[in-house]
Amino acid sequence: MTDVTIKTLAAERQTSVERLVQQFADAGIRKSADDSVSAQEKQTLIDHLNQKNSGPDKLTLQRKTRSTLNIPGTGGKSKSVQIEVRKKRTFVKRDPQEAERLAAEEQAQREAEEQARREAEESAKREAQQKAEREAAEQAKREAAEQAKREAAEKDKVSNQQDDMTKNAQAEKARREQEAAELKRKAEEEARRKLEEEARRVAEEARRMAEENKWIDNAEPTEDSSDYHVTTSQHARQAEDESDREVEGGRGRGRNAKAARPKKGNKHAESKADREEARAAVRGGKGGKRKGSSLQQGFQKPAQAVNRDVVIGETITVGELANKMAVKGSQVIKAMMKLGAMATINQVIDQETAQLVAEEMGHKVILRRENELEEAVMSDRDTGAAAEPRAPVVTIMGHVDHGKTSLLDYIRSTKVASGEAGGITQHIGAYHVETENGMITFLDTPGHAAFTSMRARGAQATDIVVLVVAADDGVMPQTIEAIQHAKAAGVPVVVAVNKIDKPEADPDRVKNELSQYGILPEEWGGESQFVHVSAKAGTGIDELLDAILLQAEVLELKAVRKGMASGAVIESFLDKGRGPVATVLVREGTLHKGDIVLCGFEYGRVRAMRNELGQEVLEAGPSIPVEILGLSGVPAAGDEVTVVRDEKKAREVALYRQGKFREVKLARQQKSKLENMFANMTEGEVHEVNIVLKADVQGSVEAISDSLLKLSTDEVKVKIIGSGVGGITETDATLAAASNAILVGFNVRADASARKVIEAESLDLRYYSVIYNLIDEVKAAMSGMLSPELKQQIIGLAEVRDVFKSPKFGAIAGCMVTEGVVKRHNPIRVLRDNVVIYEGELESLRRFKDDVNEVRNGMECGIGVKNYNDVRTGDVIEVFEIIEIQRTIA
């Protein structure tokens, strides 16, 4: 066969010349592109490539087995543990030369073992034979000595006994020969047993050394191929080893003892204490008693306190705080008791308390703000930069029946007061009025004492307060309260002295009384404008409007008109056909129909907007009051209204506020429970008046609830079981029946299903339209629960003139009735020198010798006092009776 060049061979093999030259170089043959290749060189290259591309030197097998192990537990119960054993083994392909070398070593090892075994057997045989010969020689010597003794003794005996002695000697000789044979057999068995044990020991030692040499030679697999336990449980490890032996069929037994010992650095290895305990258990013997390890320490090293960074939200439970500090809940409770606060492990505590406890225990506290989402939503709003003048928001305040609503009616030329029950404004009305000089927004607040929170809310949302004072009535309690609200809000006050047309009007007295509370007229050097008006005659109305606009110019009121709107809820209620309705006063921006609003705990999209006249509007600018529809629920009056971008985020913020309010409420309730614990223990039985309250608007619900709760006394407490806005439903009636409560409807009525429940349960249902009547009737109901007052009333006096002795009653006082009537079986007091010396009961009352029930003034009688004999002449017997007086709540 002719030689071929590198280029030709590369073309045949369909590879590049450079790659082929490199392959020849790897095979130890240096060639260039133009060199020729012989057949031997080609065969060398092929052998090299076959060896290089042969199968893998290593083969890795992974196996996973699952089993269940029943572990005995405390109390005789056992629990099942699922065990999963994962194995990974690597098998290495041996080199043929290495295999031959190992085979030769094994053959030499086997020959050495066989030689050692034969030598041991021969040595044991020699020792056994020598020992048997020595024992036989000694036995023969002993027998010869005994025979000599017996022969000497036989010579002294009578000759007729020689035949018998001969027979006995023969039998004894046979017996001795048998004993010698038995002794020789036992010696041979003992020698054979020792020989076998020695051979077995030598073979086991040789096999162990061979196994160790084999594993040392095959030590190429790394720690990944080592067999390790996947659990630290002793029972699970035993089950794993049993499973390994079943699967492997006894393969690799030579290293079981070695593998049972965990390697250094193995994270699954047992601890030192566990290993000592296992060794002690093995050494325990038949009794199975464990002995304490002598190497185990008798003390534990004290652990150093770890100071952690504890992140605390606005509220947290005691258990969660303990987990954050990695301590037991009992330690946190002890720390709180040291600080003077009692708590349970599930109690919610506020951020300040949790901070004190954590710092007291040596940890660093990180306070977390939980309203980050809320702040992000509020900051992502479009607000215009240019501020424009806006209309003033004016709140009319004053005492009840001083003419606030009538004054506003005249300004608006409507009859709003006629629609209010009893002529009293029940909730805030918001109206905007167009005048010749500009627009003014009026807020009408109730003047009754119950509506304090509503009045305060009106003052916070206003720019100017018009204080209406009746000229004939002067300053009244609600007038003073309105002044305080105005001062707290920091808004200017314009005083409207109303009812100036009445003959008994005295405006100067009004000025003097208001000056005592810091409201000084301008003519006296003060800052407040005083305007004399008459809501009925219409006098002074223009002057009042001019004064309001003048004050607004001084304030330079401005607001951003463009951008997302924000404002406040003036009033809210639940309409049966429209759902939740909120009266909103826009402060800045423009509120459009379709905007997404966030309002306290509620959110929603503005589906419709109406002004105070009930007309549909599409937008509302600053200082404009509107009713909006589309909220998820009835918001609380006074809540902030904000237009946001995303309805989903608005919902998240609303839900977060609800959860936060609930947590704070629970924390407050827990705190009040702990603080009032001892007070509740001592106050005894307290009667409760349960009430389910429904009203037309949210403001009325708040006002009535506050007024009723203030009626509570130490003996009778008012408890509002449920309250809400809207008509009385079947759910309200069921709640009232379950809690034995009174159903109160303020400007609302019960529906048909609720009336059926009320009739079936015979519930007490009451309708009201004026708050005075509601409070008076609840007072009457509470008065009926008061226990009556016991009063002692003196009905007669009798003077002791003489004392007689009676065998039946003892000392009998002969008396003259000086005042009133003395009645039998009534309680009495015995007075001596006007000092009570005894209080008891009149047992016997006689006139002459007849028993009588009563003796009137000016008559003589005999009186026997029960269980009392120390009656003297000159004493006065006072007869009284106990009467019950029904108490009332003031």
Swiss-Prot record:
Biased composition regions of type Basic residues, renumbered to the chain: 252-266
GO cellular component: cytosol
Domain tr-type G: 389-558
Region (Disordered): 45-304
Basic and acidic residues bias locations: 92-217, 267-280
Residues with PTM N6-acetyllysine: 808
Protein localization: Cytoplasm
Keywords: Acetylation, Cytoplasm, GTP-binding, Initiation factor, Nucleotide-binding, Protein biosynthesis
One GO molecular-function entry: GTPase activity
Nucleotide-binding recorded as keyword: yes
Matching PROSITE patterns: G_TR_2 (PS51722), IF2 (PS01176)
Residues the record lists as binding GTP: 398-405, 444-448, 498-501
Region span, G1: 398-405
Region annotation (G3) ranges: 444-447
HAMAP family registered for this protein in UniProt: IF_2_B
Protein name, per record: Translation initiation factor IF-2
Origin species: Escherichia coli O81 (strain ED1a)
Lineage, uppermost ranks: Bacteria, Pseudomonadati, Pseudomonadota, Gammaproteobacteria, Enterobacterales
Gene that this sequence comes from: infB
